[in-house]
Amino acid sequence: MKWLRRVGVVLAVFVAVLVVWVGVAAVVYSPEYVIRVLSSRESEVSDYLDGFPLRTLAASPEPYTFAEDLDEDRVRGLFEAGFGVSDFDAFLRDGDTTSFIVIKDDAVVYEEYFNGNDRESMVTSFSVAKSVDSALIGIAVDEGFIESIDDPVTDYLPELAVRDDRFRAITVRDLLLMASGLDYQEMRWFLFNGDDPLTTYYLDQRDISLTNTNIVDSPTEYFHYNKYHPQLLGMILERATGMSVTEYTQTRLWDRIGMEYDGAWALDSVESGFEKMEAGLNARAIDFAKFGRLFLNGGEWEGAQVVSDEWVAESTVVDPALHNPDYYLSLIHI
């Protein structure tokens, strides 16, 4: 029976350590943050719809509607041949696809929804939000709110330089390139202090981005995925424009490209009210297609230049020096 007592002692010590561990995290961060982390699960398509408060983007007063020229059987045949599958719709359904739309010459040729979704279903951008972040920065440069993406980030976030003078060497461009030299470790020895949970679940993303970012390398040397970058870009947008990210998105993008439906930015919390810049833009699939159309047309929408063609060109050309072909100025190459 001694082994049972030993097991009981070990379990009791483990539980006590766990309780202390959770308690320390609740004091250092907040009880709400600890609850968010402990209740987190594998990523789901609804995470940024159900798990966070939302700030609405209203449908455009002048909605743009794609024409229809459906040729779904031809599209299915092309993809079935290309992917080597016998049933393209089943392939999409089995892959947990929510929606799949093909548009050619401004006309919808294929539009199907899967797994309980339809045209009215709101879906989350996930990292496509970073491409929207980039466009918003480009528009802010066009409008003169941001003088240049080669400005030091401390021109807009001077408190960073107070904490570490080396922040003066980091530019807005470095944030867009994910090449700032800032430390980012998805998980650390303590469940609650990894950068992934902090940038996902912490209830004040402005605070954590200003106080928990540390320089470990010189900027521009290499690409390193880092979710503090889009958060800092969001703060720069706020400071430079005097608007919330949602308001700037609404007036400079949503209204101008004729979004048919309401959308929403997920927020870190009601109290902080800061948009989750790394992944938290929600919209209907057909409206996300309009963002793609904007860039296909060099930033022009129905005769109006929404974002400069110079920005579109620069933000979609890969810089081989970064050794990463997937990101340039926060645009993801597919």
Predicted regions located by residue number:
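Conserved small/polar residues in nucleotide/adenosyl-binding loops
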Residues: 332-334
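N-terminal leader/targeting segments and the immediately adjacent pre-domain N-terminus
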Residues: 2-118, 145-146
